[in-house]
Amino acid sequence: MSSYENYHKTSRVYDKTRSAGGVETILQALVAGPLPLQQQVLVDAGCGTGLYTAALIGEVQRIEAVDLNAGMLEMAQSKLTTEFEEGRIRFHQSPIGTLPLPDDSMDAVMTNQVLHHLPDDAAANWPGHTEVFREFARVLKPGGCVIINSCGHEQLEQGFWFYRLIPDALQAVKEKAVDLGTLDALLQESGFDALHREVPLDLVLQGDAYLLADGILDPDWRRGDSIWSLVAADALADV
C-alpha cells in the first residue's frame, strides 16, 4: 500500500501510461542465478496491476505476486486468468514487509518502482526499507537474488520533463526515495552482497505516453505517476 497514493482508484487507469520497462535487465539477473529460468520461482513484491508479472510469467516456473491493494491485485488477476488456472501464478494480498511465503523458498525477488511508497523515516535510517529487505532475505534460497527497479535522486531531478513544473512534489518524492549509497548500505546490512547497478535504456527513453506534452492536463495520464498525488490543488491549477 502506498503511503501517499490512492491506488484503489488509480488501478483502473494505471496501465494507460505505464509499461514493463527494464524486463531484459531483470531476465539477465535471473539467468545469472544457479537454476535455469524455467525452474525458478520469482516473487513480484508490490506487483501492482501485474505489468511485470505478465511480461515474465512465460519465462519462469511460477510467480508469487504480492500487493496490499485489492484494486491493483484485481487488475493483475484479470490479465493472468489462464496462468492462475494452470498454477503458474499465485496472488497474495499482503504488505511486502511480511510476505506470506516460507523461509528459503524463493529463487528471486523483484520489486519495481515500489520502495518510495513505503511509509518510512529517513532520520531513523529507513527502518521500513530495512524490514522489507530482511524479509526478502528470509524468503530467498541461498544464492537467490533481489532485483530492485527504482529511481535515484539524480534520475528524479533530470529524467522526467514534467517534474520541473511541480518542484514541491519533486522534493517530497526525493525525501521518500533512498539515495543510492544508502540503498547499497541497507542491502548489505540485510545480508546482500555482490551488488550491481544498471540503467536500462528503455526506462531512460520512456514510452510514447511520456512524450505527450498535453498529458499533464489529463487526470488519467497523471494517475500513471504517483508524484501527482503530492501536488496541492492550487499548485495543480498553475501547471
PLM region spans:
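Short alpha-helix
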Residues: 175-190
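A short SAM/SAH-binding and catalytic strip from SAM-dependent methyltransferases
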Residues: 108-127
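Class I SAM-dependent methyltransferase SAM/SAH-binding core
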Residues: 43, 49-98, 131
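A short glycine-rich, Lys/Arg-flanked "PGG" loop and its adjoining helix->strand segment in the class I
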Residues: 127-142
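C-terminal helical/coil "lid" or tail adjacent to the Rossmann-like core of SAM-dependent
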Residues: 203-239
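Conserved class I S-adenosyl-L-methionine
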Residues: 1-38, 51, 72-75, 82-84, 145-174
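A short acidic, Gly/Pro-enriched loop at the edge of an enzyme's catalytic core
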Residues: 97-109
